[in-house]
Structures are given as C-alpha cells and as structure tokens.
C-alpha cells in the first residue's frame, strides 16, 4: 500500500469550490475581526497534502504505541486515506477535538517515574504537521545556547559549549533543576507567547485544544489545566518556546546560558557571581514563568567538581594539556553495570546473540559519549569485558571433554589442555590463565563477533 495519505485528491481543498473550505473561512471570520489582522495562511500550510504526508511518514518512522483509541500506525493509513477530507473540514470549521492522551509511566534512574502522555496516531500526525510549519518560524528566534529538540543540535554540542566557556574563565556553574517541567507549563503564558509569532489564530486555538485535551488514566479522563505532556510530537517545540523567554532574558544580562530541554546551566567566573545567579534565575523561573525550581537539586558548583558537576551524563576535567570533556562517574557505573548484565553467565548461554546484544548497546553508547576523553578507561573496561566473554565461553563448554577438545582445536598442547579442562578453579580465575590467553585470543573472539570497545572508541573519538 502506498504511504501517501490522500486517496482521491486532497488538492481539492485548495479549490474555491471545496465546500468544507468555504464553510471554514466563514466560521473563522469572527476570530480575524477580534484579532484585527489580515488572514494568514499558516493553517492551510499545515493541512497541505505534502506537509501532512511528510508528517505521517515521520510518525510512522518513529513507531510508538497506540493512543486511547487503540489505533495502530498501520491502521491509521487507510483511515486517513478515507477520512482525511472529513478531518480537514472539521479542523477548518473549528469543530475538531483532540482525543485525551494515554498516561504511561516510565521508571526514572533516581527511582521516580516520568509521566508520558501518548496521543492517538491521528493526533500525533496532526501535531507533527503543526511542528513542521512552526519550526522555521521559531528556529531563528531561539538562542545559540539552546540545544535540545532542535535540528543539527545535540547534547555533545551543549557540553562542548560549556567547555568553550570554561576555557574563557567561566568555571562556576549554576545547575537548575525544574520540578516536573513538562507537566507544569502555564497554558495562559504559553498561549500569549505563541501569539507573538503565530499570527494565524486558528493555529493558536488548535494548539490550545491539544493542551486542554486531557489525560486518560485508569479509564478516567482528567482535565489538563497546565502542562504539555511528554510523548506528543508538539510538546518538545512548545517546551522550547516557553523556556526561550528565560534564555533570551539571561542572554540580555550577558550570562552564558546552556540549555538542553529542561536541563539548564548558567555560567559565571566566580562563586559569588554564581550564587547571585542562582537566586535571580530561580526568581525569574518561579515568578515570571510560574515554574517550580527544585531547590534541593539546584546548586552552584565548579565545572571541574569530580562528582558534583554533571550535565547530560558528561563532566569536565583539566590537566596540563587543558580542559577536556569526560564521562561522569555515574554514567560510567551505569555503562559497566549494563555490560555486566549483558555478559552474565545466565545471559550468555548462546554466545553469538549475546555478542550482538553487547555490540548494539556499546555502539549506541559510544556514539553518544565518544566525544569524551577516556582512552585509558576504555582500555580497562575493554579488557574486563574480554575476560567476561571468555568466562561465558568457558561455562558454555561445560563438561571436561568438550573443554579439552576445544582447547586442543585452539592449539593448546595436550598436557596443558587436559590440566586446564580438569581445573576446579572458578570461571573468572580460569579466564586469566596462560592457557586461556593462548586459546581464546582477542583476535579469535573478534572474529566470532566480539565488539572491541577500545578500537571502536578510537574510530569514533577521532572525529572530535
């Protein structure tokens, strides 16, 4: 089935004869009289067949679970092909009501939960169509210090910017923690911010309906008087629009501000200056933007503090060569813990699938953290993982005869092979013996699918 939504010519909407379109223009006339502005065409651009098709393909690529109506992404295509004109007409007439989002709770590393709101596939597609038209409007308005949910910007760019400022003497950071940011965005403030740059009031009203669509939890729809639930395609952009006021305010004050979504760092050249910044920034966020700053987690700290400065999993260090990006200790701990889980003897009953799982996880981790300086650490953890895999192989061989036979195939002399095969030493001890070093070389394991972390790191890090 073709992935284009339109089935029988959505371009009819662009014609003056389109019945729904004509009704739509009449029904929105009151809005324009109240606003006193010319009728812009942003809603038409959002609902244009090309933009809507692109939005659906993006939603399909992102996959995701069904919303409250239970409709899957695969089921949405034939539905849209049949009903898109009806959907479009309802939006133009101002009669479209988004469905409530489905509440999903995701465990957080700190023991809490992150509440997500999953819209229906139809609403996700429409939200994506809106986002695609709003991004070109807002991108020029966002500051250079904003890195989250933006084209060609990422966490690596954010930590590199902090490093750049640190090299200029900004070595004290104000780390701000917002409590339940997405769930506490003030609707009135956000709508007023949107009206500054979105001149098509129909679009503003449509976004407002999404904000007010409600949340279904345990079969009960709960009204949403504040917040923009995480999980929708539009929420990241709205979150950036809201905090852009904070970014621009402190940019005007000459304060370096680095932000990734709701992770905020302000930089100063002295501890006293950072303490003043903590007070003024907290006051602005709480009084002007009606947000809640978590005062227990928000703090001032040196950017070189070994454990206390952490931003997006990264930290900074310095030596005789200068300032460098490093992986924070907690991020290292999580990495090693996950590798330990993937290479456990219980998980490694079949070696090749286990090696593939380790490869997929480690490659993703390195693509994110590869910017950091960690050659020595990576060599250490690579050696540790190498022995973990050998331990799994040794356990998989189980009986003495299998161990002896495989050791002989790998070139181990008879006497050493027999002695090792009969050893009652533990798995970990055995993997460090001369015989095992002789038999299960790193090259042999690599040929079997072992992902050499040290080599992979070097190939990734060289790009930085």
PLM features: what roles do these ranges have?
Residues 372-395:
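Short secondary-structure subsegments characteristic of cysteine-rich extracellular domains
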Residues 47-52, 100-102, 109, 349-369:
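Core structural elements
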Residues 388, 397-464:
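Extended C-terminal regions of large enzymes
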Residues 212, 288-356, 361-363:
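A conserved non-catalytic segment of reverse transcriptases
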Residues 90-105, 109, 141-303, 308:
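Conserved polymerase palm-domain catalytic core
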Residues 223-226, 324, 340-353, 365-377, ...:
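Short, solvent-exposed helix-loop connector elements
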Residues 1-81:
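Non-catalytic, polymerase-adjacent accessory regions of viral genome-replication enzymes
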Residues 75-98:
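Amphipathic alpha-helical blocks
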């Amino acid at each position: 089935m073709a992935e284009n939504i339109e089935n029988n010519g959505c371009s009819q909407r662009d014609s003056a004869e389109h019945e729904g379109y004509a009704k739509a223009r009449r029904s929105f006339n009151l809005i324009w009289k109240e606003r006193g502005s010319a009728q812009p065409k942003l809603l038409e651009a959002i609902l244009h067949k090309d933009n809507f098709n692109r939005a659906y393909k993006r939603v399909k690529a992102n996959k995701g679970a069904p919303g409250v109506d239970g409709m899957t992404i695969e089921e949405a295509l034939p539905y849209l092909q049949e009903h898109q004109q009806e959907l479009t007409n309802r939006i133009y007439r101002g009669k479209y009501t988004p469905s409530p989002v489905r509440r999903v709770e995701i465990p957080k590393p700190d023991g809490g939960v992150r509440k997500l709101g999953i819209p229906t596939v139809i609403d996700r597609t429409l939200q994506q169509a809106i986002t695609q038209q709003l991004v070109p409007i807002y991108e020029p308005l966002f500051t250079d210090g904003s890195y989250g949910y933006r084209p060609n910007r990422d966490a690596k760019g954010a930590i590199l910017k902090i490093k750049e400022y640190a090299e200029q003497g900004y070595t004290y950071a104000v780390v701000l923690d917002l409590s339940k940011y997405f769930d506490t965005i003030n609707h009135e403030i956000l709508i007023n911010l949107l009206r500054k740059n979105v001149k098509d009031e129909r679009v503003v009203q449509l976004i407002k309906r999404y904000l007010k669509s409600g949340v279904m939890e345990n079969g009960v729809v709960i009204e949403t008087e504040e917040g923009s639930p995480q999980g929708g395609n539009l929420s990241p952009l709205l979150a950036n629009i809201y905090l852009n006021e904070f970014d621009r305010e402190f940019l005007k004050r000459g304060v370096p501000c680095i932000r990734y979504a709701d992770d905020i760092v302000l930089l100063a050249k002295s501890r006293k200056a950072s303490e003043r910044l903590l007070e003024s920034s907290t006051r602005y966020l709480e009084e002007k933007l009606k947000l809640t700053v978590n005062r227990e987690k928000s703090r001032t700290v040196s950017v070189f503090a070994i454990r206390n400065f952490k931003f997006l999993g990264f930290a900074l260090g310095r030596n005789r060569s200068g300032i460098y990006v490093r992986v924070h200790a907690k991020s290292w701990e999580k990495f090693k813990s996950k590798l330990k889980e993937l290479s456990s003897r219980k998980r490694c009953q079949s070696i090749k699938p286990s090696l593939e799982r380790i490869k997929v996880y480690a490659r993703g981790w390195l693509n994110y953290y590869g910017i950091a300086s960690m050659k020595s650490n990576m060599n250490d953890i690579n050696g540790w993982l190498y022995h973990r895999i050998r331990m799994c192989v040794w356990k998989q061989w189980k009986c003495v005869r299998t161990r002896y036979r495989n050791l002989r195939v790998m070139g181990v002399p008879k006497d050493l092979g027999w002695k090792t095969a009969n050893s009652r030493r533990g798995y970990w001890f055995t993997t460090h013996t001369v015989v095992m070093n002789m038999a299960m070389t790193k090259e042999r394991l690599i040929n079997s699918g072992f992902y050499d972390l040290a080599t992979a790191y070097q190939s990734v890090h060289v790009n930085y």
